[in-house]
Amino acid sequence: MNLCSSGATASTTSLSSTGQRNGGTSEGGGEGAGGGGGSGGGGGNSSNDGPSEAIHCFGSNGGGGGPEEVFHTSHSHSTANGGGGGGSSNGHSQQHNENNATMPPETRPKMVTVKHPESNKPKPTTKKSKPIQADQDVIKALQRCRDEGIKRLDLSKSSITVIPSTVKECVHLTELYLYSNKIGQLPAEIGCLVNLRNLALNENSLTSLPESLQNCKQLKVLDLRHNKLAEIPPVIYRLRTLTTLYLRFNRITAVADNLRQLVNLTMLSLRENKIRELGSAIGALVNLTTLDVSHNHLEHLPEDIGNCVNLSALDLQHNELLDIPDSIGNLKSLVRLGLRYNRLSSVPATLKNCKSMDEFNVEGNGMTQLPDGMLASLSGLTTITLSRNQFTSYPTGGPAQFTNVYSINLEHNRIDKIPYGIFSRAKGLTKLNMKENMLTALPLDIGTWVNMVELNLATNALQKLPDDIMNLQNLEILILSNNMLKKIPNTIGNMRKLRILDLEENRIEVLPHEIGLLHELQRLILQTNQITMLPRSIGHLSNLTHLSVSENNLQFLPEEIGSLEGLENLYINQNPGLEKLPFELALCQNLKYLNIDKCPLSTIPPEIQAGGPSLVLQWLKMHSPYRQM
């Protein structure tokens, strides 16, 4: 029955009936494609490495989704996997069972119980017949598509090698999903699908496209990610209705001037190719809102980029850019600009016109300064990342440049001081990373950073901490490793919200008794210092799970360590004076890892030590004078 001609909602089909499909793999980038629709929507993977942009295609009953990708210019790699959208799907496994039930006995997969190694050997014909069976299934799916007037067809992840010419009969199709197959070329008959609006061909082996594709004059979304294209197929330049074009992860080396014909494009991804030049044609794409040309070999941008006045996300990271044109200042709608890991020594002062930007990230360049007052002009900034450059001082512009900022990263530069009062207006500043600089002291007004939550001052030359650090009562993470600190002020006990305290590789000899007041502390890292004893108050750290005191001068552990019931990891290795462990350590029932290497423990037999934490704890318990209690 033809559902379309009868007035019913157009159906959707796939090789696994109407069930759910997951999108292909993604590796970041401002892209989203493929399936989804209706009440479902295309799912997939998301990662933090490109402009936030996702496309969900339209369908009646939901269904399979291509990969959905999001990029952020910050150096973050946290990922989350989302499932492919499905309108009324019960999941892939249920589909599999349903399909098995409806397949003829001769093609139904068999359940095999392995009794002998020989029975697990695959049949010689199994692998050879799979592509043939897949291609036969395609023929059946196309017949059904033709007979029922189906508008949405999902043949993704089906091991298809060839699309038969009978595809021309599926003239009702508006969406065709062929991603994650083994297709080397498309038949010319694909051009007969004149109603096609969405075509997903990502994750195949395409090297070209047929010229007949130009007949698909309603095509809006074309996904060609992860193929083997050495150039942008010429026919693409004639698809003037395209609004979204994904060409990520191919082998493209150049962009033809004909690109200017695609004036309706709003999203263009050329990420992860081999492009060395982006011509002036890019300036004709005045409707672009997202442009991703990251991970290429660009050294320059054309001035014409300034004509793309609707751009909100421009990702240029991981190229070889030597400069940015002044015309970048015309992009007043720009929210995110990715410039990480290029070869920039400066950025144009005109960037101060891009007042919609909420993030400024130039990590991994060769910059020594920013234009005067530029950051202050970008009053909407909330995140500033200047790490891994050659800055010797804070940018000029005074406190005004950090008014609305909550995160500042200046890691791995050559800055020797934090100016007094520089954060006096930064009432929302919660995260400051000054790791790997040349700081010798902290500013006297550090006590005014009252909203700070995370402070990283590792790998500097700090010799002391000011007493005013006690005012940072919202601080949860304090990293002071690899400095020259000899002591910790008693006032540290006022920082009651601390969860992580890292003091590794300093010159500390004594810990203050007040450290026992840090009841929220979960990780205490003290390794590579000169500590001779731990304060008895350490037993009050009821939330401590990780304690590292290796490479010190400990003579003993306090009995109170037995109160750390939540302790999971204890590092006391390489303490040459530590000859015995307290029996109370056996009370740490959750201890999973105990490192006692290179400690001259004379009381515990070597074979017990070699047996791991549980055996050591058992031995301590058995030999404890309190064991009868």
Curated annotation (Swiss-Prot):
It comes from the Eukaryota. The keyword Repeat applies. Residues 21-45 have a biased composition (Gly residues). Coiled coil: none annotated. Residues 1-19 have a biased composition (Low complexity). Residues 1-133 are annotated as: Disordered. Belongs to the SHOC2 family. This is Leucine-rich repeat protein soc-2 homolog. It comes from Drosophila pseudoobscura pseudoobscura (Fruit fly). The lineage of its organism: Eukaryota, Metazoa, Ecdysozoa, Arthropoda, Hexapoda.
